[in-house]
Curated annotation (Swiss-Prot):
This is Lipoate-protein ligase A. The gene is lplA. GO terms for biological process: protein modification process. CDD domains: BPL_LplA_LipB (cd16435). Belongs to the LplA family. PANTHER family: LIPOATE-PROTEIN LIGASE (PTHR12561), LIPOYLTRANSFERASE 1, MITOCHONDRIAL (PTHR12561:SF3). It is an enzyme of class 6 (ligase). It comes from the Bacteria. It catalyses: L-lysyl-[lipoyl-carrier protein] + (R)-lipoate + ATP = N(6)-[(R)-lipoyl]-L-lysyl-[lipoyl-carrier protein] + AMP + diphosphate + H(+). ATP binds at R71, G76, A77, V78, F79, K134. (R)-lipoate binds at K134.
Length: 338
C-alpha cells in the first residue's frame, strides 16, 4: 500500500479548504506523506496568533465580500484570490522536514522554467531586474508526532488588492498580536506568461512523486465529496465561525474618538477573546447619562459591529429624547469597528 496521498480541492471556499487540511492532519497515519493542493477565492488569511482588526481593513473586506480565515499555523496575514495556488505537505515525524517540501516546490518551479531560491525562513524568491521578488510564502505547524508546511505561489494574483485589505485603517490599537511583515512580491506570470493553476499543480505533483519514487491517484474533493474525513462537519463549523476567525484574536485595546455637533466622545475598549472586558466613555456632552449607561451595557458585549449597534439602539427605550444623538453614535461605532 502506498504511503503517499494526493488531494486536490475543487472548492474555492477558504473555510472548507482549511477544515479539510485540519481533518487530514489530525487523522493521517504517521507513516503517510500527504500533498494537498487548493486555492481560495477572495480571502484574507491570518496567522493563528494575529489580530484581524490590527492586520486587516475589515470594513473594506466586508464591503467587497472578502472573507476572513484564521489558519492553525503561525505567521502573518496574506490575501488570497484565484491567482494564488496553495499547497500543503504533511508527514509524520521524524520524517517531516520542511526542507524536503521546500525542495519539491523549487524543483517544480525549475521544471516550469523558473529559477527560484529559498530566502530566510519562509519565502521563495526570484531574481528580477528590480531585485529579488517574493513569489511564495509559507507557514508551518508541528505536533509531537507530525508536522505540515503550507504556502502559496503567486501566479497571477491581483497585487493591487493586497494593499486594499492588508493595510488597516489607522485605528488606535495597542495590540499584542503578531504584526505581518510586508515583502516585495511578483507574479509568476511576469516570468512565465500564461502559466495556469493546473500547470503549477501538475508540476508540484510530479516533483512530489519523483522525490518519493511512487505515484498515486489524486482524490478530488469538494463540499459534495469529502472522502475519509472524520469529524469534518464539526471542524468546518469551527473554521467558519466568528468565534474562531475573530474571537481568537489576542487581547487588545481600542481607542475611538469623534466630535459630534452635540459634543465630543472618546471610547476606550479592552477586548479579550472577541468580547469587551472593559468599556470607558468620556464626553463633554451636556447630557452624558446615555453614554454612561452605554459603558455599562457594552461590558461583556461581542466586539462586533452589529452587536455594538444593537446595544446603542437599546438605550432609546430609556433615553428617547436623545434619539438623534444615540443614532449618530450607533452608526459611528458600527462603522469604526468593522
Amino acid at each position: 500500500m502506498s504511503t503517499l496521498r494526493l488531494l486536490i480541492s475543487d472548492s474555492y471556499d477558504p473555510w472548507f479548504n482549511l477544515a479539510v487540511e485540519e481533518c487530514i492532519f489530525r487523522q493521517m497515519p504517521a507513516t503517510q506523506r500527504v500533498l494537498f493542493l487548493w486555492r481560495n477565492a477572495d480571502t484574507v488569511v491570518i496567522g493563528r496568533a494575529q489580530n484581524p482588526w490590527k492586520e486587516c481593513n475589515t470594513r473594506r473586506m466586508e464591503e467587497d465580500n472578502v472573507r476572513l480565515a484564521r489558519r492553525s499555523s503561525g505567521g502573518g496575514a496574506v490575501f488570497h484570490d484565484l491567482g494564488n495556488t496553495c499547497f500543503t505537505f504533511m508527514a509524520g515525524k521524524p520524517e517531516y522536514d520542511k526542507t524536503i517540501s521546500t525542495s519539491i516546490v523549487l524543483n517544480a518551479l525549475n521544471a516550469l522554467g523558473v529559477s527560484a531560491e529559498a530566502s530566510g525562513r519562509n519565502d521563495l524568491v526570484v531574481k528580477t531586474a528590480e531585485g529579488d521578488r517574493k513569489v511564495s510564502g509559507s507557514a508551518y505547524r508541528e505536533t509531537k508526532d507530525r508536522g505540515f508546511h503550507h504556502g502559496t505561489l503567486l501566479l497571477n494574483a491581483d497585487l493591487s488588492r493586497l494593499a486594499n485589505y492588508l493595510n488597516p485603517d489607522k485605528k488606535k490599537l495597542a495590540a499584542k498580536g503578531i504584526t505581518s511583515v510586508r515583502s516585495r512580491v511578483t507574479n509568476l506570470t511576469e516570468l512565465l506568461p500564461g502559466i495556469t493553476h493546473e500547470q503549477v499543480c501538475e508540476a508540484i505533483t510530479e516533483a512530489f512523486f519523483a522525490h518519493y519514487g511512487e505515484r498515486v491517484e489524486a482524490e478530488i474533493i469538494s463540499p459534495d465529496k469529502t472522502p475519509d474525513l472524520p469529524n469534518f462537519a464539526e471542524t468546518f463549523a469551527r473554521q467558519s465561525s466568528w468565534e474562531w476567525n475573530f474571537g481568537q484574536a489576542p487581547a487588545f485595546s481600542h481607542l475611538l474618538d469623534e466630535r459630534f455637533t452635540w459634543g465630543g466622545v472618546e471610547l476606550h475598549f479592552d477586548v479579550e477573546k472577541g468580547h469587551i472586558t472593559r468599556a470607558q466613555v468620556f464626553t463633554d456632552s451636556l447630557n452624558p447619562a446615555p453614554l454612561e449607561a452605554l459603558a455599562g451595557r457594552l461590558q461583556g458585549c461581542l466586539y462586533r459591529a452589529d452587536m455594538l449597534q444593537q446595544e446603542c439602539e437599546a438605550l432609546l427605550v430609556d433615553f428617547p429624547e436623545q434619539e438623534k444623538e444615540l443614532r449618530e453614535l450607533s452608526t459611528w461605532i458600527a462603522g469604526a469597528v468593522r
